[in-house]
From Swiss-Prot:
It is an enzyme of class 6 (ligase). Its EC number is 6.1.1.12. Catalyzes the attachment of L-aspartate to tRNA(Asp) in a two-step reaction: L-aspartate is first activated by ATP to form Asp-AMP and then transferred to the acceptor end of tRNA(Asp). This is Aspartate--tRNA ligase. ATP binds at residues 220-222, 229, 479, 531-534. It comes from Flavobacterium johnsoniae (strain ATCC 17061 / DSM 2064 / JCM 8514 / BCRC 14874 / CCUG 350202 / NBRC 14942 / NCIMB 11054 / UW101) (Cytophaga johnsonae). It comes from the Bacteria. The lineage of its organism: Bacteria, Pseudomonadati, Bacteroidota, Flavobacteriia, Flavobacteriales. GO terms for cellular component: cytoplasm.
Amino acid sequence: MYRSHNCGELNASNINTEVTLAGWVQKSRDKGFMNWVDLRDRYGITQLIFDESRTDKTVFELAKTLGREFVIQVKGTVIEREAKNKNIPTGEIEILVSELTILNTALTPPFTIEDETDGGEDIRMKYRYLDIRRNPVKNSLLFRHKVAMEVRKYLSDLDFCEVETPYLIKSTPEGARDFVVPSRMNEGQFYALPQSPQTFKQLLMVGGMDKYFQIVKCFRDEDLRADRQPEFTQIDCEMAFVEQEDILNVFEGLTRHLLKEIKGIEVDKFPRITYDYAMKTYGNDKPDIRFGMKFGELNEFAQHKEFPVFNAAELVVGIAVPGAGNYTRKEIDGLIDWVKRPQVGASGMVYVKCNEDGTYKSSVDKFYDNDDLAKWAKATEANPGDMIFVLSGPANKTRAQLSALRMELATRLGLRNPEEFAPLWVVDFPLLELDEESGRYHAMHHPFTSPKPEDMALLETEPGKVRANAYDMVLNGNEIGGGSIRIHDKATQQLMFKYLGFTEEEAKAQFGFLMDAFQFGAPPHGGLAFGLDRLVAILGGQETIRDFIAFPKNNSGRDVMIDAPAAIDDAQLKELHIKIDSI
């Protein structure tokens, strides 16, 4: 037996107990006649003491050779600690060591294994197995495990069945590029790694597995951002014989359950807003509603004056920033420079100070009087002491720019408290979106999403106005889940493929198996998928998902620890019938 207890469980009630511990040397303090060693494992730290007057000489001398991160086993007696440490659970005791075994030595780590380390991100990713020993990373992985267990418990209690679906599937157009896997036994043919288990979970519904879930790896070969990984994990769910309301209720319940069990928070409100309302009011379809600053459209009050910039704009829109009326000109100019950055792309910005006496001071006083600006204040719900910032230009582009400014200001003003949680549903998404370059419509979610029955007639005349039975769950400005009611009959699915530009032959080649299944009695069904990585990061109060993934990739999609991806040798390429052009 390597250990009778772990390094986080012993306390004063264990005094005089003989114990065996094993772990890593965190640090040691050699005072000549006395040597203290902090022994660490996943559960905590226990102090060991080697006393020249009470410890066997051989053991005492061996303890002096211990280095950082040596793996050791000790046997000894729990005794009361003279200098108690109230900051750790084991701070009342220490172990008077009688036996010491060095299980493995260790090189000096390239960074300190401490909560606050001196290692940069690159070196910590290269030695990720060492980084996992640090409390912040270890605790993030344990936190992820707890969330996953609560998900399984909640769904299992509702009679959901966890079913695994294949990882080697057929490449189909789902939006992002597929990762492809060559088949040695089928020359010139390839599998793809799934971007989601979408078609398989629909086939499970046809198969009668009416409540399915899976915590599953998915893969997308796309350009990476700080919050994206080429492989990611979904809480994937599907239900048969349900309407949209049934699905929203189940997964609203899951979210409430997680917030209560993980964070101890009861959620009172769970608003539902339409996609159109979200875009008009917040400028994006995943609004952060922990704070206000709703958009106020100002065309009616700002145009038809003498200010040519607003007169030429498709949209004039502003937000009221609480308490920002005392911003200096330097601070305002800094914000103007911020919105002019290429990442935002605004050409300029107008500001209005809402004075405490009910008057207004703006950068366009030459064109607008106090009564005009009072109307702007009313439209943006501005109060005395606030500042109104106004952008103008093409409607969609301007809303996106103001949305970016809204989020930046909320961050600067401390309005995005990571311990406050404000979930909501966004519903009634457009079924299709137009690609302006190709002139073709694309499915906003995926081609299996059903249109709202009352909008079916619009498919022939105004396809861009057709609404989908689709819904996203948003938490603190992040889309954490999305889903839809699916098409479950062949005729409607064929019609959808037609509007997406598929020929009959292409649709059959790509998705014939699904349409065939629909002919054998497919039930009405729908589902949803949560992004587990993003969900645990938000619940854990962190900005990046990497901290919650054991072995993440970097921003270039590389695993620098194992140096992947990597070339394969010519023999493997030949066996796979692959020839690589010169690079």
